UniProtKB/Swiss-Prot annotation:
Belongs to the FAM178 family. InterPro entries: CANIN_dom (IPR044276), FAM178 (IPR026161). Signal peptide: none annotated. Pfam families: CANIN. It comes from the Eukaryota. This is Protein FAM178B. It comes from Mus musculus (Mouse).
Length: 464
């Protein structure tokens, strides 16, 4: 007696002597399934957007910000009323524009008020926008009312900036060892009623951060020596962590980039602080794509910006390949020579050995799936590393003396990466990596043509 599956595939003769298959649905579905699997395309593609880090925890209600008025002496009945009022009443002064009437054209603006307004930048946009506008106006107004030789301009300290970021919900233990501020049991009804009018949390967070970035930029422009080199390095690390928040991945970083560029120019001991800064920034995230996005926070419009982009990219590549301790960054080797040492380690097969330390599952189905997942991770990592390698080269002023080093990089790129990528319709991530390798090779060849020494003829087959 035949099994049901056999019966499904057994032809029967109809009365018209024509052959037909009875109950062949299962057989046809299996056949189509095999056909689909054969020509299926993997959904795992290399995303152009970095995954981001969870830096800020969602916070529905703002933390109370109390004005320290213990040392303030009122100069008018209205100011006395403001200083003695509760927080909701003081906020109404801000919303109604009464604070501008009190302090905008006053001879001296009290520093506790400026500190209070800076803390209010972490509140919902309805309040933070007014706080930023008044903080900006008071700061600018003070510049025109003070003589240049005796000018006093308030800038928040590094600790105050950290506290503001913590009020926004930042919880990173490396930056905030005391832990995030706890939610207060007291919720201000005046602000809670505005929640329905507020933009989405990601947009609201971006608005608040941009207010902070703009004011810090103003501080650095007015007082170039506002912070020591050590404080600048810590502040840049804090800002880079904040910029990698997962909710901000798709939002522009214009204000952050301008602030980072200005902080970079304010470092006194340069290039002595370059390597410590790169080492600190290379540990801001453990994901290679996030670190690539971090490099792109720094614009290449100044010599220092290009130096940092190049050195930071090199340090990140070394860290991802486990070579950060062994690579002689302080030696007299050029960055192209150091990159040449790392490029051979970026071979997909070498990366596969590093990422595939764990044994693959024994069953055939799980082994195939795990192998495909590993192949995707290898191509994803190689794509980020190769992009960083392109940043290193593009940040250099290639001279004829470096022609040989760049020629060697072209050969290594073709030998170790391009020829080791086997494209497949089922693995589009390989195609994207292959495209990047080809584009990088073409750009480097173009650089070779422009910096070719006299009497030299470049041959890609020449053995160096």
């Amino acid at each position: 007696m035949a099994s049901p599956s056999q019966q499904a595939g057994t032809p029967e003769i109809s009365s018209g002597s024509s052959q037909c298959y009875i109950n062949n649905l299962d057989y046809l579905l299996q056949e189509k399934r095999m056909l689909v699997e054969k020509f299926s395309v993997s959904l795992q593609v290399i995303s152009p957007v970095h995954p981001g880090e969870t830096v800020f925890l969602p916070r529905r209600h703002p933390l109370p910000c109390f004005l320290d008025s213990s040392r303030l002496k009122p100069h008018s009945p209205l100011e006395e009323l403001f200083l003695r009022s509760s927080l909701p009443e003081q906020l109404s002064f801000l919303h109604n524009g009464l604070l501008s009437n009190l302090y905008l054209h006053a001879a001296d603006c009290p520093q506790p008020l400026l500190q209070w307004l800076f803390q209010l930048l972490t509140w919902p946009p309805e309040t933070s926008s007014r706080a930023f506008g008044l903080l900006w106006d008071l700061s600018i107004d003070g510049l025109f009312r003070q003589p240049d030789e005796d000018m006093h301009f308030w800038c928040p300290s590094l600790q105050e900036v950290k506290e503001v970021f913590s009020s926004l919900g930042a919880y990173n233990p490396a930056l905030y060892p005391q832990g995030p501020f706890q939610h207060s049991a007291r919720v201000l009804e005046s602000e809670a009623s505005l929640d329905s009018q507020d933009p989405p949390q990601e947009v609201a967070l971006d608005i608040k951060l941009n207010y902070i970035y703009k004011f810090l930029t103003l501080c650095l422009l007015v007082r170039p020596v506002s912070y020591t080199d050590a404080s600048i390095l810590d502040l840049m690390e804090l800002l880079c962590r904040a910029g990698l928040d997962v909710g901000l991945c798709l939002l522009p970083k214009t204000d952050l980039q301008q602030l980072l560029l200005l902080l970079l120019e304010r470092i006194q001991e340069w290039p002595g602080k370059l390597q410590p800064l790169c080492c600190a920034l290379s540990w801001v995230s453990d994901h290679h794509h996030n670190l690539l996005a971090l490099v792109q926070f720094f614009l290449d419009v100044t010599p220092r910006g290009r130096q940092l982009r190049s050195q930071l990219s090199l340090v990140i590549i070394a860290r991802m390949l486990g070579q950060q301790e062994s690579l002689p960054f302080s030696a007299e080797k050029t960055q192209l020579a150091l990159l040449s040492q790392l490029l051979s380690l970026m071979r997909p097969s070498s990366l596969r050995q590093c990422l595939g330390i764990e044994t693959l599952p024994s069953s055939l189905g799980q082994h195939s799936k795990a192998s495909a997942e590993l192949d995707y991770k290898v191509c994803y990592l190689c794509h980020s590393l190769l992009t960083l390698a392109g940043v290193v080269v593009s940040s250099q002023d290639i001279t004829p003396n470096q022609w040989g080093e760049l020629q060697l990089l072209c050969m290594q790129l073709d030998r170790h990466i391009s020829t080791h990528i086997r494209e497949s319709p089922q693995a589009m991530h390989r195609t994207k990596l292959k495209d990047l390798a080809t584009q990088t090779y073409i750009r480097w060849q173009d650089l070779l043509a422009h910096c070719q020494p006299q009497g030299q003829y470049f041959s890609p087959w020449k053995d160096i």
